[in-house]
Amino acid sequence: RHATALADARDLDLKRRLGISFFDEPTDVVFAEQGDYQLRLSFNAESPNGPVAIEVKPVEFGVLGMLHGVLGVDHMGSDIWSQLVYGTRIALAIGLSAAFIAVLIGTSVGMIAGYMGGIVDEVLMRIVDVLLAVPTMPILIILGALFGKSVVNVVILLALFSWMGIARIVRSQTLSLKERTFVESAKASGASSGYIMVSHILPNTMPLIFANLVLRIPSAILTEASLSFLGLGDPRVPTWGRILQNSRQFGGFTKMAWWWLLPPGLALTLLSLAFVFIGNAVNEILNPRYRERS
């Protein structure tokens, strides 16, 4: 019978038996210096059925750390740099999708409430007030646990609980625009309410909507990272929050594994700041009143 002996440098039990720290690379400890090494095999072969033949084939060594870039590996031996790069795409996709859906819902609700007025405005604004009073994070945690862990579910939940602010902003702008002369002229010419909202009110609120769209993106990215850090994100997708969650769960915080902690944290901070600066710049360019105050 043929048997193969395999020693994996990522094996935690192997590190424990060799007295090596969880975050140390065994090759750096076992082969600390350059040069020739002698490998000694000790075995005790006994068989009641006859002689035993032992065959030793060429031994191969693979230095894992040399194959995984500057950020090293995590507890599973996975390349952290690759996870960080892939997580950038996921963060942008989640932030853009959730912000776009939220702005679409908020713009529609705010424009209808502001233009129609009366009981429609009252009902829609009371719904907005109720949702604003609800603590968002606990609700997201409960709903995320109920509907499953997937990127699509996270995007939908983030969008459904982040449109209320833009709805109020668009409503106030619509209340001002519907009293303008060009809107009154459109009403006098027999234009429908839908046509007036789409053709006259929406174009005049687009600068405000676009600026708020950009500012909604970092909020969605940070909220998704928080959910992933709490273990409510998709376990199959290496998001930045998932990287931080793995580092917390498997000792990265206690061992101060900076290559595991700092990159996703800095990525979240820098990307959020970038969108905040872009949003402020867009708001200053498209909003004359904001430019005058600045």
Language-model region placement:
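Alpha-helical transmembrane segments of integral membrane proteins
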Residues: 73-294
